[in-house]
Amino acid sequence: KVGNLDSMRTWSDVRDAVRAYYLLVTSNPISGEYYNIGGTHTCTVRKMLEHLISISTCKDIKVEIDPERLRPIDADLQIPDTTKFTSHTGWKPEITFEQTMEDLLNYWREQVKSGRRYLNR
């Protein structure tokens, strides 16, 4: 069950985000300044899901739109401007979208294999 598949998102790996936060706190941040961090790969939620399904060993996946997962207001496109953060810290995303999706899928394969399931939906 999914929500809006047509929303565009800029995907980033949490490992890149953690590295960004670390760089920020260790780079003498300017008090009161704000910084945007984010990935560089932009695509629809549908394309992300199609990619996950394409690298999955399970091919009979049924995708169902769940009205309860649709947001009343949903930004069609979200792209962070990381210019200021990059110039201040030298940070840029290192982990590709494809690697992130593969690692995500492998993580959940291990969860299922070990009997640990954290999603109740």
Predicted regions and their residues:
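Non-catalytic, hydrophobic alpha-helical segments
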Residues: 17, 21, 37, 48, ...
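Generic structural signal for alpha-helix termini and adjacent loop/cap motifs
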Residues: 24-28, 55, 88, 107-114
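PAPS/PAP-binding and catalytic site of the sulfotransferase fold
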Residues: 44-56, 100-101
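Glycine/proline-rich active-site loop of Rossmann-fold NAD(P)-dependent oxidoreductases
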Residues: 14-15, 23-36, 41-44, 59
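Amphipathic alpha-helical segment in the mid-to-C-terminal domain
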Residues: 14, 45, 75, 82, ...
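C-terminal "lid/loop" region of Rossmann-like NAD(P)-dependent oxidoreductases
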Residues: 4, 34-35, 46-49, 58-77, ...
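Amphipathic terminal alpha-helices
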Residues: 97-121
